[in-house]
A protein has these predicted regions:
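Membrane-water interface segments that mark the loop-to-transmembrane alpha-helix transition
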Residues: 22-45
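Transmembrane helix-bundle signature of multi-pass secondary active exporters and lipid flippases
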Residues: 1-11, 40-44, 74-81
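C-terminal transmembrane helix end/exit motif
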Residues: 9-13, 82, 86-90, 117, ...
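Helix-loop junctions and terminal segments of transmembrane helices
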Residues: 3-23, 90-93
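Membrane-interface junctions at transmembrane-helix termini in multi-pass inner-membrane proteins
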Residues: 18, 76-105
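Membrane-interface helix-loop junctions in multi-pass transport and translocation proteins
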Residues: 108-140
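Interfacial segments at transmembrane-helix termini and the short loops linking adjacent helices
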Residues: 31, 49-79, 125
Length: 154
């Protein structure tokens, strides 16, 4: 499901963001995409979570039943990841390459550090909880970076 969303973002959303000149139109496009993507993402996430036992049985074997506990944080992280990417794509569309690279490197390092700490504290579920927290923080940073655009008064 992530591949469907990211492919759509690359094919439609990124070129669309690049061609928009007006901040008002850009803001409207961003909110329009959120209104389209978030419901799909919620349905997909809830569907996968609800069918996690079936998915594990079909794709793996009984030895992997323990991974069912990892789904919640993984899917929550995926939700925050896509929500943050909808804003991060603005950096690419607006030639903010340096900021994009710095933020990607910074949050890759933060994920590694969070994962090491959380795995030590919580075991294997620490990896997926670190992933969810990392992308929650990334979404917060993207909202901070684009706060003037997102929260501008009409």
């Amino acid at each position: 499901y992530l591949m469907v969303i990211t492919s759509s973002l690359s094919v439609y959303y990124l070129p669309r963001l690049a061609e928009i000149k007006s901040d008002v139109e850009l803001r409207n496009e961003i909110f329009s995409i959120y209104k389209m993507v978030i419901p799909f993402l919620l349905l997909a996430t809830l569907g996968i979570y609800g069918m996690r036992d079936i998915i594990i049985t079909l794709l793996f074997n009984k030895e992997f039943e323990g991974m069912r506990e990892l789904f919640a944080y993984q899917l929550l992280g995926d939700f925050f990841k896509i929500a943050s990417w909808l804003l991060a794509y603005l950096m690419l569309a607006r030639s903010m390459s340096k900021l994009f690279v710095v933020s990607e490197v910074l949050f890759s390092v933060s994920f590694a550090l969070l994962a090491m700490c959380f795995i030590d504290m919580y075991g294997e579920i620490g990896a997926t909880s670190a992933y969810a927290l990392n992308y929650f923080l990334y979404l917060g940073v993207m909202m901070l970076v684009f706060r003037k655009l997102l929260f501008a008064k009409k």
